[in-house]
UniProtKB/Swiss-Prot annotation:
Name assigned to this protein: DNA polymerase sliding clamp
A GO molecular function held by the record: DNA binding
The UniProt record lists the keyword Plastid: no
Keywords from the named record: DNA replication, DNA-binding
Length: 247
């Protein structure tokens, strides 16, 4: 069995919105400890991983199941969530469906057919990064939007004094500079200077669910995948993005 109740359907909608921009489908690995999932995007450029501990739920009951979901259908359902709706997720093993229920003055129930997909063997690799930056999510998102004016990729740079997001087009360029003592920087731990380029569309998709007040943890090195971590309503999201190879 599986049944989980969350206080805010709208908050979980942000999670589904974010991962559905990168993935078409996903297999949720459910057990008594919570829910885990990881998958590569179809182009094998990005890895998406999420963890929902049982403490993120108001109520939670589960034994071990793999629940395959079409994320486009899940997104359409979650878009129907209202501001004060509670979210109930429950597995109907007899009908092989996941019931998505919004509870407020009444109950609205949607039943999603399960996909026959196995849990991904792809996991977030254990990589030791030389640099870790913690930055306010809204500041990072705004810098990416600025970069999007001129380029389809960004160069992320870090040294012991600052974190820089640089974009350069054919004629124009822009730069967002966050000094170590900037109000946007929570912490800047740099062991070696780093500079790497990344696809901007992927980065913007990865931070789609970030709201004002959220903190993003950025792991950066030279010629290493970029790693991003942040949480939405107790759901822990991790993304890896391959660096852009300069021609």
């Amino acid at each position: 069995m599986f049944r989980g109740v969350m206080e805010s359907a709208k908050e979980f909608k942000k999670v589904v919105d974010t991962i559905s921009t990168l993935l078409d489908e996903i297999c949720f690995e459910v057990d008594e400890e919570g829910i885990k999932a990881s998958a590569m995007d179809p182009s094998h450029v990005a890895l998406v991983s999420l963890e929902i501990p049982r403490l993120a739920f108001e109520e939670y009951e589960a034994d071990s199941h793999d629940i395959g979901i079409d994320l486009e259908a899940f997104k359409k359902v979650m878009n129907r969530a209202k501001a004060k709706d509670r979210l109930i997720l429950e597995l109907d093993e007899e009908k092989n469906k996941l019931n998505v229920i919004f509870e407020n003055t009444g109950k609205r129930k949607f039943s999603l057919a399960l996909l026959d997909i196995s849990a991904s063997s792809v996991k977030v690799p254990e990589i030791e990064y030389p640099n870790v930056i913690m930055i306010k999510g809204d500041a990072f998102k705004e810098a990416l939007k600025d970069a999007d004016l001129f380029s389809d990729y960004v160069i992320l740079k870090a040294d012991e004094d600052k974190f820089v997001i640089h974009a350069k087009g054919d004629l124009n360029e822009n730069e967002a500079i966050f000094e170590k003592d900037s109000s946007a920087i929570i912490s800047l731990e740099v062991k070696e200077e780093a500079k790497s380029a990344f696809n901007l569309d992927y980065l913007m998709d990865m931070v789609k669910g970030v709201s004002s007040g959220d903190i993003i943890k950025i792991y950066l090195g030279n010629d290493m995948p970029l790693k991003l971590e942040y949480s939405i309503a107790g759901v822990n999201l991790t993304f890896l993005l391959a660096p852009r190879i300069e021609g």
